Amino acid sequence: GKIIDCKTGETLVQHEFPPELIDPVCTFARYWNVMPLTYDAKGIVTEDAANPYVGEEARINKIPARQVENLPAEIQWPINKLLLVGDPVDMPHVEELMQQKFAGKLSIYRSAPFFIETMPLGVEKSASLALLLKNMGLGPENLMACGDGWNDLPMIRYAGMGVAMG
């Protein structure tokens, strides 16, 4: 939910996760044996830094994971998303239940077999790319987008040339 101009460091757009939904999302995730995490300036913040899927997120992004007692109580800063991590066998069902429970409140997509992204409503890659193209005076016909996750489908469809990678 955040777009930063890499040249200037200026934040062009920031969509903050609704603070009133942090605890309900974390409670729901825990109920289904899924681990919520978010990020601060130092890396990942989670209730179980030893969770193998938390470790995978840390490895992918080359950042450390810090364990806290209670994630919702710990979050005292604006966040852009909560990432839910868990067993790939369970995640399609959990994603479906989350989409039902938080319909009209959050955007929810699986980005990998073991990751569910929960973001402010309307936040998705295609909307962000549309904003960037508009700022550049361009349209989707000028965009090539490649993606390899379920959360990439809207972006791939939006682009003039969309490529789904295996």
Placement of each model-derived feature along the sequence:
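Alpha-helical substrate-recognition element adjacent to the catalytic core
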Residues: G1-E20
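Conserved acidic, metal-coordinating active-site core of Asp-based
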Residues: I22-P24, F28, W32-C146, W150-M155
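C-terminal catalytic core of tyrosine-transesterase DNA break-rejoin enzymes
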Residues: A159
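Short, well-ordered beta-strand core segments
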Residues: G162-A164
